[in-house]
């Protein structure tokens, strides 16, 4: 089955696939499904991240947001909007503090407040197709759009503080506003 996301944490590897979550630890491979039906859309895991104390694994799926407790295996789910086509669900996520930032195919970036367990929209980026999202873990969320370049969102102020976009007059600029992936190094560059 197709692998959509990998997350390494020490000697543990979390693998998000089209058929659920796989956890490789101590030479063993454990499969975890959000639904008993292997073909259910919620088993299509697009991205993964850990909470602050590494006790919960967050799963962005095409049918909502899921949490998987690494202590007891309990699975919980949240849905931003009910009865929305599969494309409106989550394809990427990152976390800063107690906030998850989730990229969607048609709703832009959505925030999830972990303690309050509530969703909210962030500012408009001029393109609601989010292809990748990353963060520095402290202050900045980096967002790639499929049509309006790259945006740097302030976690504290919830506004865009910088952006890169295609400009025909800038020969040194990016060549397209369709950006499909981001890689942020430990310096936030």
Question: What residue spans do the PLM features occupy?
Answer:
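Carboxylate-rich, polar loop motifs that coordinate divalent cations or form catalytic acidic clusters
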Residues: 1-189
């Amino acid at each position: 089955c197709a692998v959509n996301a990998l997350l390494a944490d020490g000697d543990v590897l979390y693998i998000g696939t089209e058929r659920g979550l796989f956890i490789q630890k101590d030479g063993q491979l454990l499969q975890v499904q959000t639904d008993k039906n292997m073909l259910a859309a919620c088993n299509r895991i697009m991205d993964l991240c850990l909470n602050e104390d590494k006790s919960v694994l967050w799963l962005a799926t095409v049918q909502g947001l899921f949490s998987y407790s690494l202590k007891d295996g309990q699975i919980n789910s949240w849905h931003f909007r009910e009865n929305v086509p599969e494309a409106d669900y989550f394809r990427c996520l990152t976390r800063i503090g107690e906030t998850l930032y989730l990229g969607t195919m048609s709703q832009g970036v959505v925030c999830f407040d972990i303690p309050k367990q509530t969703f909210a929209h962030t500012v408009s980026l001029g393109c609601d197709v989010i292809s990748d999202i990353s963060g520095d873990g402290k202050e900045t969320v980096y967002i790639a759009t499929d049509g309006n370049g790259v945006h740097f969102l302030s976690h504290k102020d919830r506004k865009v503080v910088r952006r890169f976009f295609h400009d025909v007059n800038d020969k040194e600029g990016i060549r397209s506003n369709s950006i499909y992936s981001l890689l942020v190094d430990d310096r936030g560059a």
